[in-house]
């Protein structure tokens, strides 16, 4: 079962908790959900998640939440464990188990939406860093003299290639493209994507600039992490080669040839559900790793985890 609803997660914690509870209830009431019992609930957050204290949220990224996840009542209602991780980490997990990363143990997943983050699989496991902040590529400063970011830095990647940054850039460039389908309108990310796919010069300019900024950040990532696959997910992944061609070009010109030659850069085939698939996969993986936490699961003794690929 699949349910979705847009909501201002960053600014409305109480509303977010209510929406999550409502969507859980709708999914579990759907005909497709009837059958085996619920094992657990996986939750993806647009924020770093400290694996040592997952209920304590980042004061920088989600300041209104007052460092409190507050989802215990949902887990208690259904009597199952709640597992939590960063959304980009879960996108990476989904790609590793079910998608384009299924043939490697080292991959990066870049989620480009309202925010920008990266999730990493290293040696077959999610890499979270010491306190869960690994992968915050959206707050790499691309232009130190650029726009002020919510994190307090200037010129962060998210201000240049995140949803709001794209919309603002389209507005800044509109006067140069009077014949654009976007001219004279409030250009949403969806409208910019549609324009770029149709060959509109303003839409293409905005996407080309965003691809260059993303490519600069990904080039650094390739030099440091050396993944075999980089999967682009989030809102922009449906652009395909319109995004990937300029992005790959920037990466090639800004990284070591040995790093870029070892990496494929692709758009996700799991689509908009990749993070949700990753959240469900985290439940499965957690149950396989420690069945004592999941009393409703009967797991046979043996080797568990993703099946090895030929």
Model-derived regions, located:
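ATP-binding/phosphotransfer module of carbohydrate and carboxylate kinases, centering on a glycine-rich
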Residues: 1-37, 52, 76-80, 104, ...
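Phosphate-binding/catalytic loop of phosphoryl-transfer enzymes
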Residues: 37-167, 278, 282-302, 307
């Amino acid at each position: 079962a699949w349910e979705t609803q847009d909501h201002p997660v960053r600014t409305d914690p109480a509303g977010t908790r209510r929406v999550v509870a409502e969507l859980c209830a709708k999914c579990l009431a759907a005909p497709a959900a009837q059958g085996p019992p619920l094992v657990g609930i996986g939750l993806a957050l647009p924020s770093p998640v400290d694996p040592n204290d997952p209920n304590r949220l980042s004061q920088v990224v989600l300041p209104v939440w007052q460092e409190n996840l507050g989802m215990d009542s949902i887990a208690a209602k259904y009597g199952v464990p709640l597992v939590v991780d960063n959304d980009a980490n879960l996108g990476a997990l989904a790609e590793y188990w079910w998608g384009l990363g299924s043939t490697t143990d080292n991959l990066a997943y870049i989620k480009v939406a309202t925010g920008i983050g990266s999730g990493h699989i290293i040696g077959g496991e999610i890499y979270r860093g010491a306190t869960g902040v690994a992968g915050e590529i959206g707050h790499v400063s691309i232009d130190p003299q650029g726009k002020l970011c919510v994190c307090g830095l200037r010129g962060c990647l998210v201000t240049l290639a995140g949803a709001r940054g794209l919309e603002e850039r389209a507005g800044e460039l509109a006067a140069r493209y009077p014949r654009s389908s976007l001219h004279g309108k409030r250009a949403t990310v969806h409208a910019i994507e549609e324009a770029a796919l149709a060959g509109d010069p303003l839409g293409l300019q905005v996407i080309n600039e965003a691809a260059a900024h993303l490519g600069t950040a990904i080039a650094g990532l390739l030099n440091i992490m050396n993944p075999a696959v980089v999967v682009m997910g989030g809102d922009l992944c449906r652009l395909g080669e319109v995004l990937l061609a300029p992005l790959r070009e920037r990466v090639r010109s800004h990284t070591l040839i040995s790093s870029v030659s070892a990496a494929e850069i692709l758009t996700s085939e799991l689509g908009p559900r990749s993070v949700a698939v990753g959240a469900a996969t985290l439940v499965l993986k957690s149950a396989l790793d420690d069945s004592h936490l999941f009393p409703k699961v009967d797991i046979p003794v043996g080797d568990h985890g993703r099946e090895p690929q030929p």
